[in-house]
């Protein structure tokens, strides 16, 4: 997914696992997630900056789902996607495993 704006094309990088997760969402939610990701490509600052151990990441809400990402210009790396009640703990575990 690419979005051009102000002569600075941005690219969204999504793992196969997250692509599969998005693909299996309910069609209405999938449409909302894709629209939100396009908005994020236009303005990566739309999300809320996360703090402490998740510092450097940002989060934005799509219904009950939170999308966690990292702005690594010229890319935006999609890190995680899931319900608020567990996504932050899941993301922290994922990051610790990756170290």
Stretches found by the model and what they are:
Residues 17, 55, 86:
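Residue-level recognition of oxygen-bearing side chains
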């Amino acid at each position: 997914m690419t979005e051009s704006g102000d002569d600075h094309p941005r690219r969204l990088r999504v793992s196969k696992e997250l692509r599969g997760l998005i693909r299996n969402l309910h069609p209405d939610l999938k449409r909302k997630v894709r629209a939100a990701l396009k908005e994020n490509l236009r303005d990566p600052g739309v999300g809320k900056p996360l703090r402490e151990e998740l510092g450097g990441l940002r989060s934005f809400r799509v219904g009950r789902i939170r999308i966690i990402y990292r702005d690594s210009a010229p890319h935006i790396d999609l890190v995680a996607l899931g319900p608020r009640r567990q996504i932050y703990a899941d993301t922290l575990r994922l990051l610790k495993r990756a170290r």
